[in-house]
C-alpha cells in the first residue's frame, strides 16, 4: 500500500516525476502475487489508484541503487540487514512522523529505530484501515521531510 499511497501524494502535489518509487518484499513468501485483495479494497475506499503489482524480494542491486529504503517495521529492518549486509539507508516509515512531531514541538531528537513504532501489520491483525492510516501518515511525513531536505540543499 505504501508505494501507491506515496505515489498518490506526490502526484497530488505535482511531484510525480521527482521520485522513483517501487516496493519489494523481504521474503519470497508472496513472490509473484498481485496486490492483496484486502489491501486493494482499502486503497479503493480511499480513492488511491493502484496498478498492476507483482511481489518480489528485494535484490542487492535494488538496495544499492536506492537512495532511501523505507520499511514498515523492525522485522523488515533486520531482514534487510540480513539480505544486504547493510542498513545505512534504511528507515522505518513512522520515523518521519516522530521527526515531524518533534519539529512541531520545537526540538529535534535522534531516535533509536527500535523506539519508533511499527506500522500496524494487517497480515496479523486483519485491520487494513489501521495499516492504511499509519502508512498514510508516514508517507505524508516522509514526503514533507524529502521536500524540506531538497529545499535546504538548493542555493
Residue ranges of each PLM-predicted region?
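Phosphate-binding/catalytic loops
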Residues: 74-155
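Solvent-exposed, flexible loop/coil residues
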Residues: 30, 39, 62, 67, ...
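Conserved active-site segments centered on acidic
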Residues: 1-66, 145-155
Amino acid at each position: 500500500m505504501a508505494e501507491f499511497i506515496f505515489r498518490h501524494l506526490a502526484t497530488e502535489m505535482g511531484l510525480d516525476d521527482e521520485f522513483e518509487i517501487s516496493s519489494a518484499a523481504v521474503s519470497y513468501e508472496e513472490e509473484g502475487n498481485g496486490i492483496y485483495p484486502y489491501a486493494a479494497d482499502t486503497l479503493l475506499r480511499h480513492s488511491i489508484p493502484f496498478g498492476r503489482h507483482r511481489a518480489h524480494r528485494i535484490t542487492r542491486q535494488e538496495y544499492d541503487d536506492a537512495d532511501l529504503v523505507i520499511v514498515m517495521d523492525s522485522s523488515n529492518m533486520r531482514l534487510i540487514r540480513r539480505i544486504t549486509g547493510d542498513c545505512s539507508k534504511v528507515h522505518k516509515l513512522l520515523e518521519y512522523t516522530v521527526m515531524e512531531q518533534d519539529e512541531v514541538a520545537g526540538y529535534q531528537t535522534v531516535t533509536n529505530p527500535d523506539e519508533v513504532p511499527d506500522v500496524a501489520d494487517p497480515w496479523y491483525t486483519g485491520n487494513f484501515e489501521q495499516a492504511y492510516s499509519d502508512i498514510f501518515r508516514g508517507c505524508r511525513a516522509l514526503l514533507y521531510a524529502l521536500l524540506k531536505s531538497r529545499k535546504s540543499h538548493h542555493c
